[in-house]
Structures are given as C-alpha cells and as structure tokens.
Amino acid sequence: MAHGGICTIRRAMSILLATLVLSACTTNRYAKTNKQYKQQLKVLTKQMQAPLPYATPRLTATYDSITGMTAVSEIPQTKREARQVASIHFNLRKPNYVIIHHTAQDSLEQTLHTFTVPHSEVSAHYVIGRNGEVYQLLNDYVRGWHAGAGKWGTVTDLNSISLGVELDNNGKEPFTEPQIYSLLTLLDTLKQRYNIPSANFIGHSDIAPSRKVDPSAFFPWKRLAERGFGMWPDEVLMTPPENFNPEDALRIIGYDTRNLDAAIKAFKLHYIQDDISPELTDYDLSVLYSLYRK
C-alpha cells in the first residue's frame, strides 16, 4: 500500500478514536449523579419497608368526687410494632398536574449542571432543549423539587402531585418550534398515561404569582389549549354582569389572591400576554369571565 494511503487510514483511525472517546465522555458525564439517583431510590425503598409506628400509650381518667376534678394518667405499655395486616388493594400515587417552567438560564448545559449538583436542591422531571431533545431527570412517580412554595386552589404542596417540565429558555426569547413540538408530544403522553385533566396543565407563575414569572409571555398557551393542555377563553367573549367579582373569579380558577395584584399579573401573563400590569381592562374582565364560567 502506498505511503499516502497508510497516512489516510491512520488519520481516519485517529478521528474514529477521538469520536469514541468524546462519546464516552458525553455518556459518562452524569455517571456520578446517575449512580446517586439509584442510591436515593434504594433509600426510599427501605423507608417504604420500615416497620409501622409504635402503638401509642393508653390513657386513663379518674374522677375525684371530693375535688370535682379529673386526673389523667398514662398506663405504661411495652413498646411494640403495630400489627400489620397487608391489604392487596393499592398502587403508586400518580401525578395529577403538570407545571411548565422556563429555565431562566443561558444554556442547556448550565441547566443540567444546576439540576445535578448537590447544593442546588432543585430539580424537574423533564428538560427540553432548544433543539427539541427531551431529557428525563426523575421518574414520574418521584417527588421532584420544582414547584417550591406555591398554591393552586386548595393545594399547597404542588411538588407532591405534579410533574415539572423545564424548557431551556432564558425568559427573554421566543421558544423554538422543535421545543414546542417535543413539549406537545410529551404532554400528550403524560396526559394519556396518568389521565391528567386538561385544566391541570399550568405554569409556574400561576401557582407562585408573588415570586415567579415563568414561562414568559412568549409561551404559546393558546396553542397548548387547542391540543387539550390547559384552559383558554372562548373566541366570542361576553361582557360580565355588574355583580361580577374578579377577585372571586381568580380564586375559583385557582389563583392565590392573598396578593391580588400579583394574582392579576400572573393571570394576564398566561392569558393576555401583551400587558401584564395589575389593572384589569374591560377586555381582561371578559377573558376572566369566560374562564370563570368554564
């Protein structure tokens, strides 16, 4: 074989080797956190298999007819595990909400780093990159740390009943078409798998109006609602009656109205989008009335 041919083969082999090394590094980049994830699942499994609580001590009450007072005393009881009679009627608790976020970071790599370092104490079930690639960080049945302090209707612990979906977006730019396409596909899967009601697809700002503004006004909520993910007002709007109370309507929809201005701004970020001031125009009231009637 000619010397030039040998050099060509060597260059090709070098490129192939470099590609394999790079691929291996990419695959193993999160090997440490993947291992920690599995270890944490084992810990949770042990917690589920732990003995039931000890029986509580019995109390006895003695009435003194002379003083007219009742004395309560504790009967000593040997600690023992409560009796267990295992029922066969159970399954895993399933998520009932999906909360959509934008990452407010400048790159997918930065977001994945944030979600995999120990000190951040924040996570989501899914992250969708600008190119539409979907990353699953948590099993759907695991309680993620994405909602934080928030409230929707009477629910005050959204983390326990929701899935968190993060979109790689800094909050100042439109969402990409591949990203939204992947999101719609993912939401369709989650909705069918867990029978999540259409109204239960909401944004982070909806549940935490005093402190969150994601997803931003660029987010296509109407497009999602047309596919069955979230609410949207009717095309033909009605003028609300004179006795219509917007604060009550916001509360009935689900918003936390303890800070009314913040609730109005969150509502407008979701449904109006081109104006997120705390004042309600006639148009805003008609939109709110349409949603309230649903």
Tell me the role of every PLM-derived stretch.
Residues 2-13:
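Bacterial N-terminal signal peptides that target proteins for export
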Residues 12-23:
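Bacterial N-terminal signal peptides
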Residues 32-91, 96-195:
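Active-site-adjacent loop/helix surface patches within enzyme catalytic domains
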Residues 7-8, 133, 265:
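Short alpha-helical segments used as structural interaction elements across diverse proteins
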Residues 11-12, 102, 269:
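Hydrophobic alpha-helical segments, especially transmembrane helices
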Residues 25-43, 47-50, 176-294:
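Basic/polar, cationic surfaces and motifs that engage anionic cell-wall
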